[in-house]
Every structure is written in structure tokens, then in C-alpha cells.
Amino acid sequence: MRVLGKTLLPYHVNAWSLAVAEEVYRQKDLYKEQLETIIEQRDLMREQLEQMGLKIWPSATNFLTCCPQGELTARLAAACEQQYGSQGEKTQQMLAGMYLYRKLLEKKILVRDYTSHPVLQGCLRITVGLPLENAEIISRLQRLCGEEAI
């Protein structure tokens, strides 16, 4: 537990959480199949999101951080202003991310919104879930990044 404590120095993690993490690590073989599924799903989602025109940041976790790029950004930004009106002094990148976030939220799909973050403008963080959940998110994003954003 001392080794874990040293690596987490800048972040506060209580002793109980560290003890649970240590026990999970000791029994990592119990979670191997689940971890393999998450990794497979993450890689599949990365591929599908890139095909839609989204930039994906490298990830070794159970989530992907992504944002529209290129021509897709302009289309989504225009769709945002058309649907929601003028958004003030927001960049196209922010508008594109905001559009995706709001449209997903309308369908009760929750993602982490980083559209106003100074370094991750227009980005969303998508958690890798169960295969059916992932398929639903991908399907919805394909519609949003495709014909709906024209």
C-alpha cells in the first residue's frame, strides 16, 4: 500500500480505496476477461469514432476523449447555431462539441463535457461500457456526424 500511496501523492485517495485497489490487484486474474472485453470495446470504439471524423486521444483507460476535426467541426458548429441559436463568443470547436453533447444528452446518453476546457476545447469523454451501450452511442454519433449535421 505504501507503493500505491507514493504514486498517488498529488491526488487524495483515502486508505480504504487504496486497500480495495490493492486487493483487486492481488486477484487480477478474476477480472482478466472483463478487462479484455473493455480493451476490445475501447479499440473498436476508437476505430469507429475515427471513421466519423473525430480525433481520439490515446487512452489506456475505460474511456476515450474525442473531438470533431476538420470539415466535421464546421458542419457541427453550424448545426449547433441553427438548432440552438447564437452561442456568443464560442469557437467552432466549442460549438461542435457542444452540439454533440446536447444531442446525446437529449437521448439520455451521458458523456463528460469538456467543450469549454482551455486545452480540450470541443472535446467529449466517452466511457466504454457494455457492448450494447457502446453500439447505441456509436449509432447516435454516426447519425449526428452524418446527415443530421448537414
Predicted regions and their residues:
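Conserved PLP-binding catalytic core of the aspartate aminotransferase-like
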Residues: 38-43, 48-107, 124, 128-132
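Short secondary-structure capping/turn micro-motifs that flank functional sites
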Residues: 20, 65-66, 120-121
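Conserved Class I S-adenosyl-L-methionine
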Residues: 60, 116-117
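A common structural junction motif
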Residues: 107-111, 144-149
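Short, amphipathic alpha-helical "lid/cap" segments that border enzyme active or binding sites
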Residues: 1, 22, 131-138
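Hydrophobic "lid"/C-terminal helical patch
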Residues: 141
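PLP-dependent aminotransferase class I/II
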Residues: 1-50, 54-57
